[in-house]
From Swiss-Prot:
EC number from the UniProt entry: 4.3.2.10, 3.5.1.2
Intracellular or extracellular location(s): Cytoplasm
Gene3D superfamilies documented for this protein: 3.40.50.880
Gene Ontology terms: biological process: L-histidine biosynthetic process
The keyword Protease is annotated on this UniProt entry: no
Family annotation (Pfam families): GATase
Protein's name in the database: Imidazole glycerol phosphate synthase subunit HisH
Reaction(s) catalysed (UniProt annotation): 5-[(5-phospho-1-deoxy-D-ribulos-1-ylimino)methylamino]-1-(5-phospho-beta-D-ribosyl)imidazole-4-carboxamide + L-glutamine = D-erythro-1-(imidazol-4-yl)glycerol 3-phosphate + 5-amino-1-(5-phospho-beta-D-ribosyl)imidazole-4-carboxamide + L-glutamate + H(+); L-glutamine + H2O = L-glutamate + NH4(+)
Domain of life: Bacteria
Glutamine amidotransferase type-1 domain location: 3-213
GO cellular component, one term: cytoplasm
Source taxonomy: Bacteria, Pseudomonadati, Pseudomonadota, Alphaproteobacteria, Caulobacterales
Length: 213
């Protein structure tokens, strides 16, 4: 049985994410133990790492540092090459830095900055809330069986802008395009909430549980 460490660092709707991961595993008949944890030892030994996150970039980074799990995550992801996925602010934390409330260092696992959305249509509001279509930029195992143009659920005021376009997997549009998904080697992140995105979101989570980068 594979162990999936769902990181508890004081940010993110953990129960919704846990429930969705369990349902995704059930639908594919996958033997996965979804563990909500802030235990560095468990994280370091996990077979997969999943990082949620809601709120401000700086507070999420501070919460991650306070738990002491960053080094364990780094050991698992870069030391052993286990698959990693971040969602919403967990996805944004992959960046080099976030520009919300000043400059806050990110994990720098995907080079780039997290910048505020600036729609070119004055009728569009921030935060960007609700369903939006994604455009797949390139094929990726995480989006296997998910249609180009699939609708996902977003709740964001900021977005990760990667320094290298080859790290972008999908985009969405809110008065201008922004990055909806990134992937590099065994690291991936999505700006939307797969746990709120119904069948397409569950398909993505199931793909993550089967992903072998």
């Amino acid at each position: 049985m594979q162990t999936v460490a769902l990181i508890d660092y004081g940010s993110g709707n953990l129960r919704s994410a846990e429930k969705a991961l369990r349902e995704a595993a059930r639908r594919r008949a996958l033997d996965a133990d979804i563990v909500v944890t802030a235990d560095p030892d468990l994280v370091a030994k996990a077979d997969r790492v999943f990082l949620p996150g809601v709120g401000a970039f700086a507070s999420c980074r501070a919460g991650l540092d306070a738990t002491g799990v960053y080094e364990a995550m780094n050991q698992a992801v870069h030391g052993r090459g286990v698959p990693f996925m971040g969602i919403c602010v967990g996805h944004q934390l992959l960046a080099t830095e976030g520009l919300e409330f000043g400059v806050t260092p990110g994990l720098n696992w995907i080079q780039g900055q997290v910048k505020k959305l600036e729609p070119n249509d004055p009728t569009l509001t921030i935060p960007h809330m609700g369903w939006n279509a994604i455009s797949l930029v390139r094929p990726h195992a995480l989006f296997a069986g998910i249609d180009d143009g699939a609708h996902m659920y977003f709740a964001n005021s900021f977005a990760l802008t990667p320094s290298h376009v080859e790290d972008v997997v999908a985009t969405a549009d809110h008065g201008g395009p922004f990055t909806a998904a990134v992937a590099k080697d065994n690291v991936a992140g999505v700006q939307f909430h797969p746990e709120k995105s119904q069948a397409s979101g569950l398909a993505l989570l199931a793909n993550f549980l089967e992903w072998r980068p």
